[in-house]
A protein has these predicted regions:
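Phosphate-binding/switch region of NTP-binding enzymes
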Residues: 45-173
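Acidic surface patches and DE-rich sequence motifs
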Residues: 122, 177, 187
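Conserved inter-motif catalytic segment of the P-loop NTP-binding fold
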Residues: 1-54
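PDZ/PDZ-like groove recognition
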Residues: 169-179, 183
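Short secondary-structure junction motifs
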Residues: 18, 67, 178-180
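Catalytic phosphate/metal-binding cores of nucleic-acid and nucleotide-processing enzymes, i.e., regions
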Residues: 10, 14, 110-112, 135, ...
Length: 200
């Protein structure tokens, strides 16, 4: 963790160009004390969170001033807590402490579905992708809390199929009306299109 933060600081100080930093992944990056210490988890408890808190307080302004982007990938972990109410309301958490959450300008929560109905398969029945649910947990650019679903593909057709999520995004628009299985999209100039969600 220390090496990642130090490298970003060094690159920001030696380069005047805008940069994109991608950290994959925060959860699997150990601190120095994790590597040099023993197997007792209590010996390095909250060390990574404290390092990240210090690191983000140092890097947030330089990243913003250079108009760079810092993209952090993380994993969901089961929230082990003694509070039954918190277990029900927040079953998952992300490693790294709250400093990262406060520093994020945009926080996107992706969860995959385990049901076979969410699998994307090819003509031979092999799985080539999966449908994920996406929620905008935090945003300094727009309305947070919005949700959509889209499909992530891997292999030769790697990428995101997000056409269906466009329909979810415009369902609340006054230009789109719904009657049964049919949607009508009004362009505002007297013309419109009628379609079903399967033909979107």
């Amino acid at each position: 963790v220390e090496f990642v933060l130090e490298t970003i600081e060094e690159l920001l100080g030696s380069n005047e160009n805008r940069m994109l930093f991608i950290w994959d992944s925060l959860a699997l990056t150990p601190a120095v004390s994790d590597i040099e210490g023993d197997f007792n988890p209590l010996s390095s408890m909250a060390v990574k969170a404290r390092i990240l808190a210090k690191g983000m307080s140092k890097l947030t302004v330089p990243i913003a001033n250079s108009q760079s982007t810092f993209l952090v990938l993380n994993q969901l972990k089961t929230n082990i807590t003694r509070s039954p109410s918190e277990t029900l309301t927040t079953p998952y958490m992300t490693p790294g402490g709250k400093a990262m959450i406060y520093a994020y300008s945009l926080r996107i929560w992706l969860t995959g579905r385990k049901a076979k109905a969410s699998f994307v398969t090819d003509d031979k029945g092999f799985r080539i992708g999966s449908e994920v649910k996406v929620k905008l947990e935090k945003s300094r650019f727009g309305t947070q809390g919005r949700q959509c679903n889209f499909k992530i593909l891997w292999g030769e057709e790697v990428g995101v199929q997000d056409e269906e999520s466009w329909l979810d995004a415009i369902k609340s628009s006054h230009h789109l009306s719904n009657s049964g299985a049919w949607f009508t999209l009004d362009y505002g100039d007297g013309t419109s299109d009628k379609f079903q969600s399967s033909g979107w």
